[in-house]
């Protein structure tokens, strides 16, 4: 059996890859133990087997490997993660080793980090609301349990701060079920890692979180394994411990860059912009691990965060992510420059399952109606502001000026809630009604009269300030 054999037939090392000759009985995805000439031990994984040659990806890098003196042993099983409920509240490196100074975990079991394929028939439909405390998400782009809703960011935007805000504020309403956050950070700097660890510790959110950190100077292969390790942890907590788990993965762009690096080392034919042709398939093996299962109490919800290179939403990473996931939250450079935090651009953002997680019994009966009216009013106000820039304020009607006033207050009060303000869904809904009261009742055509009678506050026209676009 290959598990009993030790090979000294390493013929080539290229970047993070190693070629072992004269192998027998070796299988794809098999875990590999590597012993260097100085006794140092490293781990690897079989990427490909052709005849009697095996290509092994190295998790700890290839520095210091002596071809003639390196010993290789194939273990006969895939890379597995030791899991335990005691992982909650702990901090790990990208390979699942504790780095917080705490005790070693006593594993309850070992799980393959690639998980198991979920039969579509076994999936339950996501329809339960998750409150993030952020109005632009909870009210306008509702997140539900089992959904995968990515955040599309740009260079220099505060996506790390947004990720930390969601991690500490997210909660399940009207439920006694346990809620946990699994946070996977890939390719981040030491300063960013310190920010995440300190923020979760200082706010107490670490007590319900599991944090995996892969630094920018860690091997690219480890970066590929980190999200799989995080998702394996989430599936264990969800399906075996009955917890509702929110998985936040940042930055998926760094993950895809690692895929491209390994693909280039394998001399594969590149696809769009040099990324491997199987990028879509590879991303789907991560994103499709979100969901709910019939007969299982827990759920896995995903918020992958990625930075769009050159703010290009047609770039392969956001483009392919959008095909797999159920919407997107888009951050805006313009809103960020104007000082709005978080700078969520609500008009191009979308949650395809928002209708399933809102309404009476989940949030409130006026949720959908106010959401649609806010979208319509904000879009019309943006159009009025653009018209004022071209033709001047005098070209605006009185109604247009009210839409401009609404748009400015919407951005300043609703979107610009701050990175440390936790709003309940009721507070977001009430604020939405307050802003809609700026407009004449006749303009609120997407809300039924009985709902207007119940929720719409009387507008104080003496206090309404009209801001023009070029103020």
UniProtKB/Swiss-Prot annotation:
Pfam families: ATP-synt_ab, ATP-synt_ab_N, ATP-synt_VA_C. Keywords: ATP synthesis, Hydrogen ion transport, Ion transport, Transport. The keyword Protein transport does not apply. GO terms for molecular function: ATP binding; proton-transporting ATP synthase activity, rotational mechanism. Disulfide bonds: none annotated. GO terms for biological process: proton motive force-driven plasma membrane ATP synthesis. InterPro entries: ATP-synt_VA_C, ATPase_a/bsu_AS, ATPase_F1/V1/A1_a/bsu_N, ATPase_F1/V1/A1_a/bsu_nucl-bd, P-loop_NTPase, V-ATPase_su_B/beta. Produces ATP from ADP in the presence of a proton gradient across the membrane. The V-type beta chain is a regulatory subunit. Belongs to the ATPase alpha/beta chains family. This is V-type ATP synthase beta chain. It comes from Streptococcus pyogenes serotype M28 (strain MGAS6180). The lineage of its organism: Bacteria, Bacillati, Bacillota, Bacilli, Lactobacillales.
């Amino acid at each position: 059996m290959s598990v009993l054999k030790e090979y000294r037939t390493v013929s080539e090392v290229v970047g993070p890859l190693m070629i072992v000759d004269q192998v027998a009985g070796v299988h794809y995805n098999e875990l590999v133990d590597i012993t260097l000439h100085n006794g140092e031990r490293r781990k690897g994984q079989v990427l490909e087997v052709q005849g009697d040659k095996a290509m092994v990806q190295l998790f700890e890098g290839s520095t210091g490997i002596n071809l003639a003196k390196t010993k290789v042993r194939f273990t006969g099983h895939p890379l597995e993660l030791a899991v335990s409920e005691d992982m909650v509240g702990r901090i790990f490196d990208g390979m699942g080793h504790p780095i917080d100074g705490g005790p070693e975990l006593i594993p309850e079991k070992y799980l393959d980090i690639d998980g198991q394929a979920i039969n579509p028939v076994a999936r339950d439909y996501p329809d339960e609301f998750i409150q993030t405390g952020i109005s632009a998400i909870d009210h306008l782009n509702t997140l539900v349990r089992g959904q995968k809703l990515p955040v599309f960011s740009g260079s220099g935007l505060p996506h790390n701060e947004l990720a930390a805000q969601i991690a500490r504020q997210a909660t399940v309403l009207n439920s006694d079920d346990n809620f946990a956050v699994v946070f996977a950070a890939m390719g981040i700097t030491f300063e960013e890692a310190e920010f995440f660890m300190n923020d979760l510790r200082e706010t107490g959110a670490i007590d319900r979180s599991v944090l995996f950190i892969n630094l920018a100077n860690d091997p690219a292969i480890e970066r590929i394994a980190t999200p799989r390790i995080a998702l394996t942890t989430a599936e264990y907590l969800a399906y075996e411990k009955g917890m509702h788990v929110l998985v936040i993965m940042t930055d998926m762009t760094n993950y895809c860059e690692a895929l491209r690096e390994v693909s280039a080392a394998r001399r594969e034919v590149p696809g769009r912009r040099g990324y491997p042709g199987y990028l879509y398939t590879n991303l789907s093996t991560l994103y499709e691990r979100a969901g709910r299962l019939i007969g299982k109490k827990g759920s896995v919800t995903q918020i992958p965060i990625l930075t769009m290179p050159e703010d290009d939403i047609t770039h392969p990473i956001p483009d392919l992510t959008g095909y797999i996931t159920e919407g997107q939250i888009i951050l805006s450079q313009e809103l960020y420059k104007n000082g709005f935090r978080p700078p969520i651009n609500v008009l191009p953002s979308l949650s395809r399952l928002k209708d399933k997680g809102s309404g009476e019994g989940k949030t409130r009966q006026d949720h959908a109606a106010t959401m649609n009216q806010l979208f319509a009013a904000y879009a019309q106000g943006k159009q009025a502001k653009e018209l004022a820039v071209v033709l001047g304020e005098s070209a605006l009607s009185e109604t247009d000026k009210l839409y401009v006033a609404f748009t400015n207050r919407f951005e300043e009060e609703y979107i610009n809630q701050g990175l440390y303000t936790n709003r309940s869904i009721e507070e977001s809904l009430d604020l939405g009604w307050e802003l809609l009261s700026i407009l004449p009742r006749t303009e609120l055509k997407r809300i039924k009269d009985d709902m207007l009678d119940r929720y719409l506050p009387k507008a104080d026209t003496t206090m309404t300030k009209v801001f023009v676009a070029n103020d």
